[in-house]
Structures are given as structure tokens and as C-alpha cells.
Amino acid sequence: AITLARWICRSYKVHTGRELLQVDSQAAGDAVLKQLWHHTDSIMCCSVKMNDSAVFSFANQAGLDMLETTLLALQDIMLDKILDEAGRKVLLSEFSKIMQQGFAYLPAGLCVSSMGRPVSYEQAVAWKVLNDDNSNHCLAFMFINWSFV
């Protein structure tokens, strides 16, 4: 988890030019993971697949709260099941940009928790998470200023 947290933060900075956290992404120990875990915006990762449904592999506490799930049950949730029709269309239209440029800003929208409750967000950011070999590891999403509606 510590390695994934470091990859998430480093990849965000590489692609957007901005820091995701207040702590250096190369910081020792679990400082990066702790800040990522307690980040106020929902941050989650899923597999990089367009032909299959992308399955979630990680979420911070805000992400688990937004999805109304646990880390254990997270792997049973698919990206296309939480996005509404408009969100799926936007993601599909931006997917090649995410893969080529490394990230994309997505407009405000709605999604749904695993319990079926509607969730609104002001903006979302999607970016490629690269491992230490600069290979694609997963896709990360940050849902900014989300709330149940």
C-alpha cells in the first residue's frame, strides 16, 4: 500500500505538474500513505481496461465513504456501475486523452454508491498511475468536493 500511495502521488505530479499531498511523494515510511488515506477528496484506483469493466483495487477513506463500502468489498465494485450515463460517456470520450497525455479533468457530475445512493462531485481528475518502471499500473480518480444528494 505504501508503494502504491507513492506511485499515485508521483504520477499525479508527473502528469498534472501539481502536488497531490503536502508531503514529498518520496518521503520515507508511511507518511505518504497516511496523508493519502486522510485526504478530504475521494481518491480511488482501478484496473486499466476498456474492454472489461474496470475493477477498483484501492480507495482512501473518503473514497470508501463515497462508495459506502470497505477495502475488502472494494474489489467487487466496477467503475461502470458507479458512473451515471453522462459520466460513462465523458470517461469514454476522454479515455484516449488519459492514456496519451496521462490525465484528464472531468466535469461535475453524478455517480452512485454501492448502496445505490446518488453522489455529486464538483470535478473529477483521472490519471495514469505509473510504477517504478514507468509502466501503467492502474488508473486513479479523484472526485473533488463530493457529497450525497
What are these regions (language model features)?
Residues 1-53, 71:
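Eukaryote-specific, low-hydrophobicity, charge-rich regions
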Residues 34-149:
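Sensory/regulatory domains in signal-transduction proteins
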